[in-house]
Amino acid sequence: MSVRGRVAPSQTPSRIPGTVLAYLALTKPRVIELLLVTAIPAMLLAQRGTVNPLLIVNTLIGGMLAAGGANALNCVADADIDKVMKRTARRPLARAAVPTRNALVFGLVLTAGSFLWLWWTTNLLSGLLALATIAFYVFIYTLLLKRRTSQNVVWGGAAGCMPVMIGWSAVTGTIQWPALVMFAIIFFWTPPHTWALAMRYKDDYKAAGVPMLPAVATERQVTKQIVVYTWLTVLATLALALATGWLYAAVALVAGVWFLAMAHQLYAGVRAGEPVKPLRLFLQSNNYLAVVFCALAIDSAIGLPHLF
């Protein structure tokens, strides 16, 4: 037997984990965390108490398939700019760890799987919402808006709001006003969250030709917009208190004051010409959303009486 014949079998297993991890990276697992943080509380609020655990699991599986499919297709569409940006240069397609055709097929399979799974285990509305989310994220945000307008994340962020709609519809089979308010919370939260990160990597966006707001506007203009959307976020969280108990309302109020203070602090620092740390707001905005929706989950699971 030749040396090549003896070495090849031992090399094959070592390549498998890397390939699996590359496909997993296409789904952007960190982005999927938003699904877990928001969908479960939405389901609990819809029921105002306990929800069948199997329904939660099935909804999360369908949601993860949908998010993974959307993210994989996004990676295919953005492969050219991912190669240019330092922050994304290690993504699978940017470093040719996965063939583009395979990534496209992978994304389409996950997309079809999400629709079929949600239709089979929950209801048709949830499956259709998942399909609509993927289509919006890929065609409207990634292909149409992202490279054409500085308001890309404002409108494109609607895709990230859909887990609450899917979670609510999985329980009720309908869409009601609390689901729309939760949609608004995430919709308004997305711009300050994303722009804070983009302030840190604005040179990357400039190099890639992506007109993210921090890449085309002054820091003062950006932070002013961050403050505006932070206020809208907090007001939306307080509006949701009309459908919750006192625990959620109290946490939303305290967390909202804290989030607003951070946004205003960033704006004040820029106005004063001081060095600022926008990445801190980006990281803490994750904590803010998690705290608010965890409070919503607990409030709903306990079944506290409505404030109003």
UniProtKB/Swiss-Prot annotation:
| A GO molecular-function descriptor | protoheme IX farnesyltransferase activity
Gene3D superfamilies tied to this protein: UbiA prenyltransferase (1.10.357.140)
Q: In which pathway does it act?
A: Porphyrin-containing compound metabolism; heme O biosynthesis; heme O from protoheme: step 1/1
Q: Which UniProt keywords apply?
A: Cell membrane, Heme biosynthesis, Membrane, Transferase, Transmembrane, Transmembrane helix
What's one GO-annotated cellular component? Answer: plasma membrane
Please give, as recorded in its UniProt entry, the membrane topology of this protein.
Multi-pass membrane protein
Predominant location category:
membrane
**Where in the cell is the protein located?**
Cell membrane
Enumerate the transmembrane spans.
31-51, 53-73, 102-122, 124-144, 149-169, 170-190, 240-260, 288-308
Q: Which reaction does it catalyse?
A: heme b + (2E,6E)-farnesyl diphosphate + H2O = Fe(II)-heme o + diphosphate
Any keyword Acetylation?
no
* Highest taxon of the lineage: Bacteria
GO annotation, biological process: heme O biosynthetic process
Q: Indicate yes or no for the key word Magnesium.
A: no
Enzyme Commission number(s)? 2.5.1.141
EC class name = transferase
Instruction: Recite the other comments.
Output: Carbon 2 of the heme B porphyrin ring is defined according to the Fischer nomenclature.
Protein task: Converts heme B (protoheme IX) to heme O by substitution of the vinyl group on carbon 2 of heme B porphyrin ring with a hydroxyethyl farnesyl side group.
Tell me which family the UniProt entry assigns to this protein. Belongs to the UbiA prenyltransferase family. Protoheme IX farnesyltransferase subfamily.
**Which HAMAP family does the record match to this protein?**
CyoE_CtaB (MF_00154)
User: How is this protein named in the record?
Assistant: Protoheme IX farnesyltransferase
Lineage, highest ranks first: Bacteria, Bacillati, Actinomycetota, Actinomycetes, Mycobacteriales
